[in-house]
Amino acid sequence: MKYFLLLFLLVLSFTLVESVYQYQILILEPIYRFTDSAAVPAKSIYFTNLPQHFSLTQKSSKLDLSQFNVVRGFTQEMFLKNLGCGTDTCQNFPATVTSVYNIIDLKGRLKFETNPAGTDNVLGKAGYLATEEIEGLVRYDEYYSEEDDSFTYTNGKYPNQFGACQLRDYGKLRYKFVRTLGHAFTAVAIPENLPIYSIFAYDDGLPEPTTTVSPTLSPTQYVFETNPIWKILKNSKNGTQGVGAVNLPWTPPVSASPIEPTNVCLLNGNSSVLSRYGEIDRMLQFFDDTHVIIGFKDSIQDASNTFIYSYIGYAFKSSDNLCGIPLKPIRELYKAGVGNTVVAGDDYSDLISSGYMLTGNIIGYTIDCNSTTDGELIVMIPDGISTISSTTILLTSQFATSSPSQIVGYYVQPVKIVGPSASGGEQGYWVDPELPEPQIGDVLGISNVCLFTASSSIISKCGYTRNIYVYYDNVDKFYFVSLYTFGRSVTSKVIGIAFETEENSCGLNLVPIRELYKDRYYVVAGNDYQYLIDDGYNITGNIVGYTVDCKDSKDEFVYGHLPSYAFSTTTSSMTTTASDSTTSDSSVIVSSSKNPAVSNPFITTYSLPSSPNNPFISITTTPDSASSQKISTTTAISHSAYSASPSTIPTTTPYDLTKPLPKLDCNIIENYGDLNGRMVNFANVMEVGDNITITGHIWQNASESTFNLYVGMDPKYLQSYISIHINMRWATDGIVYNYFWGMWNYQFESYSTRPFSRGLPYVLSVVRGINYYDVYGNGQFIKKFGIIGSVALHQVGAMYGYQQWNIDTVKMNCARSHTTTVEPSTPLETASTSQSTPSATLTSTTENIPSTSKIPETSTTQRPTSPILTSGATSTSSSTESTTTSPTTSTTTTLPPTTTPYNLSAPIPKLDCNTIQFYGNLLWRPVVFSRYMEVGDNITLTGFIWNNATESNVNFYLGFNPLFGTTAVPVHISQRWSSSARIIYNNFWGQWGPEAFSARPFTRGQPFVISLIKTANSHQIYGNGQLLINFGYRGTASQNLIGSMIAYRESTIDTVSMACVRPPTTPTTTTSTTTTTTPKLTTTSTLPSTSTAIATTDVSTRPRSCDINSITLGEGDANTPQLQLDAVLGESSGSSLSIYCRGLPNYSIYMMFNVNQGGPPPVIDGYLEITLDCLPDSEGVWTFGGREITAISCFQAPKCSTFVPSFWRSVDLPILSPTSRVVMLLTWQ
């Protein structure tokens, strides 16, 4: 949920005054775009009411509306819906609005109009726009094309002025800015079958007392004003009571009056200072049909007919704070017929005696009003907590290369405006760090626009960035600066890097790059452009990008936070106590005394060197390592009496984002971070039989994910021709295919099914045929796309993936070898590694290239629980560790990789000192260990954090039967992305304990590695290779016997690994899946064949002969309490399958087999589990006690009576003995 806030600060005699924010829900009217797909180029019109368009079947003399036959959906900008609106007011919006109409003008052109003329044909009111610029609203501009004689509408915030599809539709049209109609709204939620709405926050103009810094206080003391929460009588039909602020500055929709104050006092003051004490948030006041309540903004997320009324103060989200503030829980109480009230702390006996009951809801934490003095709270900041914002720290351009830094400098240079040279010519722009002065003319001046000129791969981690060009229009003979060509015939030169929007994650103060015009001269400026207006320039209305103002730079650097990098995971062996690694040389190199559970000697450290002589930021690694001749390591353990045998502690190596991408030359590009939005150029054009494969993750909130194969070498995005365009539109079920040859031809759009899912990994492959492409998704053939036009012209030389997915690797498998020298495709050296592991594994890859083969065949065998080893050959030893690095790269030819989908139907095996992977997203799936964690054991999770994550959690449970919300949790790890930059740790033993905190090294939209290591009296948690916290035991050692885990909320879990100090006592059981993908090509070209074996363990199991999907499981009903329960699949070991059902603790649980057949004896403890057998002679049928089982249903009843459905008449219970059979007559009680 997005809130737009207007800050209004008054500083008067040491008093900071912060205004009250009013929150209001606004219902919006979406604007739909309709396109005439037959027009070349495509034309579009805009309507705000979808049925209205279809009702206009009549043909105007100037305009045939029926020809606009393609609905492009609604735009990002929306009008205020016409609900209770007047001349200049609508929905109580606190600013002046103006009406907007759909009209057809005298020339027969459809457009929006705020003041229709008498000659205009008014079709209907479209909605309302705000008349003034307010933060949170977007400018709504009108553009006109002379070529097309039509109007189009968009906002002035985006540099290309149109969305991607609109820009393609209008690629050959030149639209000129006409006017700004007003300011439009954007939606924060688009629910199904509900109104589209936005939440708007505005300053009410009334001062609210906040932090007062008295001259008598020390610099570390702050005063916060407090205000009590009042009981409020809501004057509705039943006159129920609520709670909220006593001073209501605005009249609510239903009037209310105060009764008396509670002892709950909220804080008001400088939130940036207050947030240094602990996790705080705004407390809001809500109202519904009958009540007035308080809570944080997320407390009504799923409530209906509940509205935000006003902001009333700050409260803490937990009882922990760093300054000793006596926080009390804000408890909610309720009395039937009266309503709600609240109390701070445990003193509520008088309310209980008067008929109130605790609801169990803890709204937040604040102080008791009795803790204040004259309504003020004085807080002293302890040593070590800075009260100065990091943005006020004086930064210099000198960075120490030996120490890591969170603040980095980004190299920028100003755009210089260049006039005609003496020999004639046109005015242009110049920025080039390699040349001291421009060579094309005289410098007229230096603009206040500074562009980034460092590596785009680094600055792109701050937000959406692209190369910005100076273009020369070959037709109209003028220069202009932009991120895109707007379909013009141009020549271009890259002059820097700019952002597409003003949003960034590095704390950079971005300003719009505004375009101004005078006498065929186009110039750019930031927010300060008055001097150009005075010189006769006019604003064109175009914003061509976002960058920094030169006044914010210092010595050609601007400073911001280091963006979070993608990480690749490597493992290094834990140091063993008194262990030796020996080679032929017997000399001792190093002796170390490091606790493996505390510090990892092999963790890579990073430094960020930067100097004026080398302005480009680079990442270097400084491994703590020595020669590998002989290493004698002695481990001194100060607090735990155990010896760590070889295991794995994850380390994290950042992708080298400073290197430009190499050309893809029949190899793989990986370890360069997210390749989304980066053009991957090929060393040679694609040939028949070549296969391009990409892998990665699809965002959980993705709306579109797109893949293009471009024609030509070194193509340009939105300019060059596209041979095949693959577009996944997640609002629909399929994939759209097309091509782009100067324009989109929607008549050639085709479709296929989509095997991918949001939030999960994917594998997408495209194989080139003679006159077609074969497309594979997750191992399935999904589309044969015929090449359109002359095949000889489709010389594909690059690929480009963009929009809402991550691209981790791009690989090309070629049908024939190329003679070119292959450069290393990754910045990491190819290594052959020998290391100590619990069990030996040998992996080899053999390529057989026959003389003739017409079909590229690839066969891959995967073992889901065995790790993939990327080295060419791996051997193991019980006491050695050595690494040999080969700096050379040889040219090899491989064939298309298999695209094996994850086996999402296979039950998850027990984690037995191994790795669970290839089971899709393990989120919400219980992972049960084969034994309790022992001292020195390490559990490691790898995965990906969603881009829109609000919370990502992991629970490590007591025992082997994790019940979410019930089973004890010795270690709970919570990342709350929307409210804190910390990680929260806790335990659950019937109730939550006190919270602990650490820094958070993870970032939304990036991969992560998190590990938990057990010691004698604590659990140590590592994140991306860093020790985050030493979390001491809560309770006894027996209360910290971790045997299972569940990860939940917004993340993707790819692997869960367990590294054990003691080898497993039972052979490792591996569940295997085998998939063979054969792309069929109707070509006579000679293609090689490759057989690849992926690393497997040496123990395999007999394939299961019974299908787990053959059992029909009953579902629970909606009664309270339930009578019928869910029957749930449990574990499967191949020859057995567990089924369980769970009910209330004091109820009896019954199971029914097949159709009205008795099941096992009932149980009284609320949990019933059985095991079905799949015997060798059962012919693929699950059995229980020799009986064939096809369906199972579960029921519960109070144990004190026989409570079963009336349709049960007589029930056969299972055979209890060979000679006895029990029959019970059950009736409705």
UniProtKB/Swiss-Prot annotation:
Record InterPro entries: C6_domain, ConA-like_dom_sf, Galectin-like, Galectin_CRD
Residue spans of biased composition, Polar residues class: 818-829, 847-869
Sequence intervals crossing the membrane: none
Glycosylated residues (UniProt): 238, 270, 370, 538, 691, 701, 903, 938, 948, 1146
A Pfam entry, by short name: Gal-bind_lectin
Ranges of residues in domain Galectin: 678-813, 925-1059
Signal peptide: 1-19
Record region (Disordered): 818-903, 1061-1087
Keywords linked to the UniProt accession: Glycoprotein, Lectin, Repeat, Signal
SUPFAM superfamilies from the UniProt entry: Concanavalin A-like lectins/glucanases
GO molecular function per UniProt: carbohydrate binding
Bias-annotated ranges (Low complexity): 830-846, 870-901, 1067-1087
Protein name listed in UniProt: Putative uncharacterized protein F40H6.5
